[in-house]
From Swiss-Prot:
Gene3D superfamilies: 1.10.1070.20
Amino acid composition bias (Basic and acidic residues), ranges on this chain: 319-330
Recorded GO MF terms: 1-phosphatidylinositol 4-kinase activity; ATP binding; metal ion binding
UniProt protein name: Phosphatidylinositol 4-kinase LSB6
Transmembrane segments: none
Ranges for region Disordered: 73-93, 318-356
Catalytic activity: a 1,2-diacyl-sn-glycero-3-phospho-(1D-myo-inositol) + ATP = a 1,2-diacyl-sn-glycero-3-phospho-(1D-myo-inositol 4-phosphate) + ADP + H(+)
Keyword Transmembrane helix included in the entry's annotation: no
Length: 607
């Protein structure tokens, strides 16, 4: 059997293994499906060409292997010409707008989950309507403030000439963005153009250029969709808001003009002083984090207990201001309850300020850090971040009034997330937080995290709303593909399924989560009645005897009758009429989730 025929139904057969396929191969399959969908009357086998259909010679029957895309499109209704999808003004005009709008409407107009693999628990009920309304109001305020800030930055570039400043570190072309305030020396945002991503065509980093030029076979990540990092940055922020983890700075797509964008002409004309060209680029705009430092720098100043073998931590009794009886449950789980509350002193390390030098790892600070880390672990796992190290998540120390400290984490550089398949070729891309001390990871998830995430991830309404929002976000890209989007969504839901199953067991933690079998949750479309038939139909069918007026009682008349039967048996005086000619086959398309195990594994699991 050929490779193409083998791949036709690999997402339909639940017992078949997921094989390695390339992004180019899927694009070729999409072109074939698109050509077939243009002629809804002709139904031919995949191996039969147009010449064979028009020929008078009878062809031998061939086995038809329907693809998953063709199966899900059978019950779908074609969109009306007067319906169009909304467009983001920051993105601008999109190519193939008509085909894309119709595909988006078909996929997102009706997304109702009839059967879900995310079974809710009675011990963790979902949030009420009042809480959801408050969350929507806060999110609307955040969106308005973000749009106002982006407009202010665009005005600063166009009116006041405050150009963007390229960030020298990192593997992509990223720029600091400033506002209109002249006294503001700190940037207000970070802009990452689409074409200057790590694997983009105009990345200004020479290391990526060398990879693309001299090592094309090892360049890029096959599990990610090319040039979609700016959408993934925004999607990570959307997922953060949907999960209410508050780790990712607000991020969305925007278009900005600047003279400092990377100009591809400079690498061809060396030694010639070219005049800067003003370019308008599309990318992701992320709010700048103030007073945050990278995690690797933070741990260099304040190493965690057990992080370095040459750093000794001595235990002392807690200060008199702390009361162990009022310690939260999550804090007691992180320490030994048989021992009195203790303080962990870090090694003397030079700091930038006297205030920061007073910070010491205590049981309270370790508990706060553990809670923030658990949120980061679940967020990274669900969106399957393939580039999480100690250099792209940040820590902030907040000094409280009672000589205590508060720790806050933030997740940045999320562009290499949301893969369309699990890594299954060369590298596994493990999470960077797995290299933290074992005493932080080898503990179960806290009850606070279980009570927070389980009601969200087991809510059918939450998944239906999330699908609509993520579909609207990913469809902003001009190369948006419904087939690839379904694969991304299946991987995300499979990761969330593992999170739910891990949180259901109070004995499991981060280490058990990453050891779980990889899976996907595929959305299968099915037709069900829009509403159950009226009770009067069943009652009439049971009570009405077969009449003797017809020569063939089993043959129904051609014109359905609208005369009420047994109206005198009804409790009310109004007879019940039912006309079967109105919507005789009123069905709707719903989603039935199906769990599929991923058996393929990459070669190297440590990098």
């Amino acid at each position: 059997m050929s490779n193409e025929a083998y791949q036709h139904d690999h997402t339909v057969n639940p017992h078949q293994k997921i094989v390695v396929n390339s992004y180019d191969w899927l694009q070729f399959r999409d072109e074939q499906d698109h050509c077939k969908s243009k002629n809804p009357i002709t139904h031919a086998s995949p191996g039969v060409g147009s010449n064979a259909q028009n020929s008078d010679i009878a062809e031998a029957p061939q086995v038809f292997h329907p693809s998953y895309q063709s199966l899900v499109n059978v019950p779908s209704e074609s969109p009306r010409p007067d319906q169009t999808s909304g467009s983001n003004p920051a993105v601008g005009l999109l190519h193939n707008a008509e085909d894309k709008a119709s595909g988006q409407e078909e996929e997102g107009s009706q997304y109702e989950i009839q059967y879900s693999v995310f079974r809710p628990l009675h011990a963790y009920p979902t949030k009420g309507l009042a809480y959801e309304q408050l969350r929507r109001k806060e999110e609307q305020e955040q969106r308005e403030n973000f749009n106002h800030l982006v407009s202010d930055c665009i005005e600063a570039v166009e009116t006041f000439g405050r150009e963007l400043e390229r960030i020298q570190t990192g593997s992509s072309g990223s720029y600091f963005v400033y506002g209109t305030r002249a006294d503001e020396s700190v940037p207000v945002g970070v802009f990452k153009p689409k074409d200057e991503e790590p694997y983009g065509p105009f990345s200004p980093k020479w290391t990526k250029w060398a990879h693309r030029t001299f090592f094309p076979c090892l360049f890029g990540r096959s599990c990610l969709i090319p040039n979609l990092g700016y959408i993934c940055e925004s999607a990570a922020s959307l997922l953060d808001r949907r999960l209410e983890t508050h780790l990712v700075p607000y991020t969305d797509t925007a278009s900005i003009e600047s003279f400092n964008f990377y100009d591809n002409r400079k690498k061809w004309v060396l030694g010639y002083n070219l005049q800067k060209k003003k370019q308008k680029k599309l990318g992701s705009f992320q709010l700048f984090l103030k007073e945050y430092i990278n995690a690797d720098e933070f741990f260099h100043k304040y190493p965690l207990p057990g992080m370095y073998s040459d750093v000794k931590h001595s235990f002392h009794r807690k200060s008199s201001g702390e009361d162990i009886n009022h310690k939260p449950e999550t804090t007691r789980n992180l320490t030994d309850e048989t021992e009195p509350s203790k303080q962990i002193n870090s090694s003397p390390i030079s700091t930038e300020s006297e205030e920061n030098s007073k910070f010491e790892w205590t049981e309270s600070s370790l508990s706060q850090f553990r809670l923030e880390l658990e949120k980061l672990i679940i967020l990274d796992y669900i969106m399957r971040n393939t580039d999480r190290g100690l250099d792209n998540w940040m820590v902030k120390l907040i000094k409280l009034s009672n000589n205590k400290w508060r720790l806050k984490l933030a997740a940045i550089d999320n562009g290499l997330s949301f893969p369309w398949k699990h890594p299954d070729e060369w590298r596994l891309y493990p999470y960077g937080w797995l290299y933290l001390p074992l005493q932080l990871l080898a503990k179960p998830f806290s009850e606070q995290m279980r009570s927070h995430f389980l009601p969200i991830l087991t809510s059918t309404n939450w998944w239906e709303e999330s699908y609509q929002e993520f579909l609207a976000l990913f469809s902003r890209d001009q190369d948006f593909n419904v087939r690839m989007w379904k694969k991304q969504w299946a991987v995300l839901k499979g990761q969330a399924f593992n999170v739910v199953e891990t949180l259901k067991d109070p004995r499991q933690g981060p280490l058990e989560l990453v050891r779980r079998t990889r899976c996907q949750v595929i959305d299968e479309k099915m037709q069900v009645p829009c509403c159950p038939p009226p009770v009067s139909i069943f009652k009439n069918a049971i009570d009405e005897p077969i009449g003797s007026y017809s020569t063939s009682p089993m043959v129904l008349p051609s014109t359905p009758s609208t005369i009420p039967f047994h109206a005198h048996n009804q409790s009310n005086s109004n007879p019940v009429y039912y006309d079967s000619t109105l919507h005789p086959f009123a069905n709707k398309t719903v989603i039935a989730e199906r769990l599929q195990i991923v058996n393929s594994t990459p070669v190297f699991t440590w990098c």
